[in-house]
């Protein structure tokens, strides 16, 4: 059985897409996923065996010196200061040049620890080095990098060898157009690094066309559909009881990261105009505190609830409790505009109608399958109007819910994963590429030249 090493820049515990890919590949390959440890969560293990052919290795997040500093800053500084004083005095006695050298090293080290931006770069570099060390030693036949932040690791492990290995770049986002990133800088980096990959996958055809426009080739597509399952067979969780809601209260659900550009502030504002139901957020993220403050200030505060992040294996049990689901991404970058949104397919799989944005990939599914209402996601009143339509018209809600039962047979991972198998099978038949700076191996449909 051939070996696959995959990299992902997270803890993996809530990454449903990577879990689906690794699990599917483990049916044909020996899969090793290299992720990042979380020192704040004791339940996350440094090594985990998901199944016989799928194992997870998590590298340490922080170098030892950073860990000691974070554990007890005062004790760390006193200890380091005392040791440094003794060493400096010794060096001064023998050689003042050595003392100056030591002082310079200490100043640079202090800057790495105390200056947040430098500390972050130092930590990230240490993670990259650990990932490379772990991945290189596995000596796999195929390396698979999820997103741009693990592509350098994949390149080093696959190409810096006497006998180069094959490398797949699996880009889940539009790396050159995301919030919080320098688009010009990222574009230059990505354009350079993709010269070294043997094949590339993106989430959908909208993004593949965009990739062709900026980089000159059309990669393969692998949609982020949910696994096909019978929602009735999932464990039952009484979310109404958990939230102290009456059994007939309609849950208006948002599940996913509490991040910028997802229209979450507008959902809270829209509750002023939604006549019935309780808005429930499931997830965590950078906006969590802000959203809770907004909810507390809202006249509808009693109708807005928060639930912490739920493990992806348990999430369907929560999703099924919803009357409708929100997916109202904001058009703040091309990454959002072009998204297919895995949350949309999670709603579909649980037979939950949606109120969604009108972006191409999302609207095509919602309108085409008639599973919900499409709105201008920047317009609070349109969001509220659509929610009220579904809340008041239970027959329409049931119709959309029934349509979800049919749509799930079309948009599911059991069908989509065959494209992943095809990509790997085609890659196996080709010789590994040596480092070369050319796009000539890619054709219009994403296939590769022999």
Where are the regions that the model predicts?
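Nucleotide-activated donor-binding/catalytic signature segment of Leloir-type glycosyltransferases, i.e.
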Residues: 282, 289-319, 324
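A short, well-ordered alpha-helix in the C-terminal region of glycosyltransferases
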Residues: 241, 382-385, 389, 396-410, ...
């Amino acid at each position: 059985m051939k070996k696959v090493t995959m990299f992902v820049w997270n803890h993996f515990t809530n990454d449903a897409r990577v879990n689906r890919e690794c699990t599917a590949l483990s049916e044909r390959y020996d899969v090793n996923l290299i992720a990042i440890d979380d020192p704040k969560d004791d339940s996350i293990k440094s090594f985990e065996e998901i199944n016989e052919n799928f194992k997870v290795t998590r590298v340490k997040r922080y170098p030892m010196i950073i860990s000691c500093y974070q554990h007890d800053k005062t004790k760390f500084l006193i200890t380091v200061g005392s040791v440094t004083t003794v060493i400096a005095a010794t060096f001064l006695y023998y050689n003042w040049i050595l003392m100056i050298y030591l002082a310079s090293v200490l100043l640079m080290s202090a800057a790495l620890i105390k200056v947040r931006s430098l500390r972050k770069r130092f930590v990230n570099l240490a993670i990259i080095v650990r990932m490379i060390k772990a991945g290189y030693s596995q000596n796999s036949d195929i390396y698979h990098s999820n997103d741009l932040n693990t592509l350098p690791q994949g390149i080093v492990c696959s190409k810096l060898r006497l006998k180069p290995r094959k490398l797949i770049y699996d880009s889940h986002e539009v790396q050159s157009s995301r919030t919080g990133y320098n688009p010009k800088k990222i574009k230059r980096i990505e354009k350079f690094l993709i010269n070294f990959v043997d094949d590339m996958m993106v989430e959908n055809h909208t993004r593949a066309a965009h990739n062709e426009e900026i980089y000159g080739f059309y990669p393969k597509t692998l949609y982020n559909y949910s696994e096909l399952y019978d929602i009735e067979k999932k464990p039952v969780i009484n979310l109404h009881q958990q939230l102290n809601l009456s059994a007939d209260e309609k849950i208006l659900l948002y599940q996913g990261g509490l991040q910028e550009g997802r229209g979450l502030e507008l959902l809270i504002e829209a509750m002023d105009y939604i006549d019935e139901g309780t808005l429930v957020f499931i997830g965590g993220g950078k906006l969590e505190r802000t959203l809770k403050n907004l909810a507390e200030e809202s006249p509808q505060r009693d109708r807005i609830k928060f639930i912490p992040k739920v493990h992806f294996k348990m999430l369907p049990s929560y999703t099924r409790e919803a009357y409708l689901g929100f997916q109202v991404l904001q058009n703040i970058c091309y990454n959002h505009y072009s998204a297919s949104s895995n949350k949309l397919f999670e709603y579909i799989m649980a037979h939950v109608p949606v109120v969604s944005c009108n972006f191409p990939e999302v609207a095509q599914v919602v309108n085409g399958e008639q599973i919900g209402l499409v709105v201008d996601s920047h317009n609070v009143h349109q969001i509220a109007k659509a929610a009220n339509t579904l809340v008041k018209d239970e027959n329409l809600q049931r119709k959309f819910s029934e349509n979800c039962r049919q749509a799930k047979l079309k948009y599911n991972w059991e069908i989509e994963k065959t494209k992943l198998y095809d990509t790997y099978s085609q890659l196996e038949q080709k010789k590994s590429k040596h480092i070369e700076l050319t796009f000539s191996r890619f054709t219009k449909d994403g296939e590769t030249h022999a």
